[in-house]
UniProtKB/Swiss-Prot annotation:
E.C. no: 3.6.4.13
Binding-site residues, ATP: A53, Q54, T55, G56, T57, G58, K59, T60
Gene name linked to the record: rhlB
Record flagged with keyword ATP-binding: yes
Protein name: ATP-dependent RNA helicase RhlB
Location (main, coarse): cytoplasm
Gene3D superfamilies linked to this entry: P-loop containing nucleotide triphosphate hydrolases
Family: Belongs to the DEAD box helicase family. RhlB subfamily.
Length: 421
């Protein structure tokens, strides 16, 4: 974490359980981020918190620290059964649930509290086997949680801590009925520590907090601008015919260490993947059609640096906690203004700088005025020389279901192609 992203407040300054502090410091966490410095005094005092902060600002560690401290400091109910978790953390996507679980593992190892993971797509029996042995903290997506609850594999009657992460995304994906179903099976709000975190605290999110929390305190960490002041934004106006060639030329020029390319449809993502894979880039594809095991493998390879480029739809734009993403390319300008912010928020995280490059083609340029109005500024425009675009490109690969989602990146230096402007 960059020091510029941290406050002077130290975790050790709080009356946190010693095992929690030890686990944090072992992972190199000494100073709090702004959202952690605001939320922890409240949760340690037993107050409910509804927090707003940009992605990448430490929200996850804020609620994990609070959850582990609370469970270590408050005994479980006397007649708690093996199928009754003590804490429930709900996430909108399986990728986010998996990442929260990974972030929680060092704390679990240090404290002895047991973790469980529940998400749809695959792994039903494997997840169930862990639950049957008893877990303290259950992390999951609402659909799989309801499946387990309806079959009495889990019982929510002993819940002491509830976390709702990416609450605005829960609404976007239509999970609000599922959330309310789960809340109705828990002890009353006054008998739990409740935490809600969201990129935006809209009216509907505040309404949910009013319904399901106990006089929650609202804490907000507002960025200087919605897109983050450490992100360099850049805009090009390519023709439809030059768009793919421009993208590949920019990639050769920028030679990003770790980049995510967003497009508006899965078919467009597959097309981009095919061009880049054929050109020798180490590229992965992440869309709703990719099988769950493969999705997790691709994310792991991208996080480890085995892949340099990830091509993704907006289904993957929220909740990806991947460090050191240097570049985000908006191959298509999104139809939803918030998606622009969420997309480019994958870079420039935790105090680092980042570069966002958007292509306003003939098909999606009409989305630009609304995006610029939403973010409160114009995106700087750059020009390019059409004659300098790459044109000796191999025929794109066509995706087959048996083909892996990456290809070897070509060895050697990037091509020496420069744009004008």
């Amino acid at each position: 974490m960059s020091k510029t992203h941290l406050t002077e407040q130290k975790f050790s300054d709080f009356a946190l359980h010693p095992q929690v502090v030890e686990a944090l410091e072992k992972k190199g966490f000494y100073n709090c981020t702004p959202i952690q410095a605001l939320a922890l005094p409240l949760t340690l005092a037993g107050r409910d918190v509804a927090g707003q902060a940009q992605t990448g600002t430490g929200k996850t560690m804020a609620f994990l620290t609070s959850t582990f401290h609370y469970l270590l400091s408050h005994p479980a109910i006397d007649d708690r059964k093996v199928n009754q978790p003590r804490a429930l953390i709900m996430a909108p996507t399986r990728e986010l649930a998996v990442q929260i679980h990974a972030d929680a593992e060092p704390l679990a190892q240090a404290t002895g509290l047991k973790l469980g993971l529940a998400y749809g797509g695959d792994g039903y029996d494997k997840q169930l086997k862990v639950l049957e042995s008893g877990v303290d903290i259950l992390i999951g997506t609402t659909g799989r949680l309801i499946d387990y609850a309806k079959q009495n594999h889990i019982n929510l009657g002993a819940i002491q801590v509830v976390v709702l992460d990416e609450a605005d995304r829960m609404y976007d994906l239509g999970f609000i009925k599922d959330i309310r179903w789960l809340f109705r099976r828990m002890p009353p709000a006054a008998q739990r520590l409740n935490m809600l975190f969201s990129a935006t605290l809209s009216y509907r999110v505040r309404e949910l907090a009013f319904e399901q929390m106990n006089n929650a305190e609202y804490v907000e960490v507002e960025p200087e601008q919605k897109t983050g002041h450490r992100i360099k934004e850049e805009l090009f106006y390519p023709s439809n015919e030059e768009k793919m060639r421009l993208l590949q030329t920019l990639i050769e020029e920028e030679w990003p260490d770790r980049a995510i390319i967003f497009a508006n449809t899965k078919h467009r993502c597959e097309d981009i993947w095919g061009h880049l894979a054929a050109d020798g880039h180490r590229v992965g594809l992440l869309t709703g059609d990719v099988a769950q095991k493969k999705r997790l493998r691709i994310l792991d390879e991208f996080t480890r640096g085995d892949l340099d480029i990830l091509v993704a739809t907006d289904v993957a734009a929220r909740g990806l906690h991947i460090p050191a993403v240097t570049h985000v390319f908006n191959y298509d300008l999104p139809d939803d203004c918030e998606d622009y912010v969420h997309r480019i928020g994958r870079t420039g995280r935790a105090g680092a700088s980042g570069h966002s490059i958007s292509l306003a083609c003939e098909e999606y340029a009409l989305n630009l005025p609304a995006i610029e109005s939403y973010i409160g500024h114009s995106i700087p425009v750059s020009k390019y020389n059409p004659e300098a675009l790459m044109n000796d490109l191999p025929k794109p690969l066509r995706l087959t279901r048996s083909r892996p989602g990456n290809g070897p990146r070509r060895a050697g230096a990037p091509r020496n192609r420069r744009r004008s402007g």
